[in-house]
Amino acid sequence: MDIACGIASLLTVDCISVSRISHPADRFTVGEYIPVVIRSSDKENDRIFVTHRELLGTWEENAAAFSPSETVSGIVRSIEDYGIFVELAPNLAGLAEVKPHVHVGDIASIYIKSIIPARMKIKLVLVDAYPGAALPPPARKYFVDTGKVTHMERWLYSPPGCTKIIETVF
């Protein structure tokens, strides 16, 4: 990633969003302008590490857009023995029970059973999956004004009272 004047930087997959993705193409297109925050630098090896996920908002900010009993669309991001992770927003995913004939990348119709901030959990019911279907690319919502913020010291993704802490210290 070129951050200006030919200065290269590294944006790793885990710094793109809190919701896990398998490849940067799941989130970005070649040549796209991507707002980032400088995470760290390695002057000895002339490397700059950047991050994007902090600009996409906290768990609480993202979860505020959803309500229990609501049916929404999402993208199946991973399938595990214990459930299917469905991305509701770039920084928010929930877990649904395993269902046959569902594949990673499918667009899914999702019923929100419950939202549990203290555990950063969203329980989902997968209503239906649509293999090969495509959602229009969502307009990314940034919770930090990238035109005004010039310095971040700490970013806390976890809601108050949550025992699991996800944070970035710059």
Question: What are these model-predicted stretches?
Answer:
Residues 1-170:
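Single-stranded RNA-binding regions, centering on S1/OB-family and related RNA-binding modules
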